[in-house]
Amino acid sequence: MEKHQIKTITFEDDGNIPNNPFHPLILYPGALDHPDNCMKIFKENNWTNAWENGVFSYHHYHSNSHEVLGVIKGEASITFGGENGKTVEVTVGDVVVIPAGVGHKKEASSTDFRVVGAYPAGMPHDLRTGKADERKDAIDNIKNVPLPATDPIFGVNGPLLDVWGR
């Protein structure tokens, strides 16, 4: 996959979901030629603490870590950025890098929809839902999340490092 094939989406703070003021979400359509190798590819590029499952059907975000999702089965409609965000159709082979603070919610999916999720250098991650009492800490956390050292698909030469800065 060529770097120019990525898509980026920027989200503003919506009052509930802070989103990320520094980095856009990055979509890699069809990046996984062999979706069964997704977890291995992420691990080789030091995106670890991986899991395989679906995506929650409520708005949520992680304030203390970026996250990558690789679609390994099925397809889904996922809204990123909170209630007024953007709904994106994802399918087998697609990869999405979600910056810390960016909300995501599964709106609909095929019955076989599965993703692999992972975090740069296996960073621990919290789960936030946009409650008022979590907002101040979440915003402080987002400001302090380090840049990943590698792109989850392409390693040290990947487009994530160009888009988010080195």
Region annotations inferred by a language model:
Residues 18, 60-62, 68-70, 88, ...:
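Short, conserved, surface-exposed binding loops centered on an aromatic residue
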Residues 62-79, 97:
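Short, conserved beta-strand element in jelly-roll/cupin
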Residues 81-85:
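Short alpha-helix capping/helix-loop boundary micro-motifs
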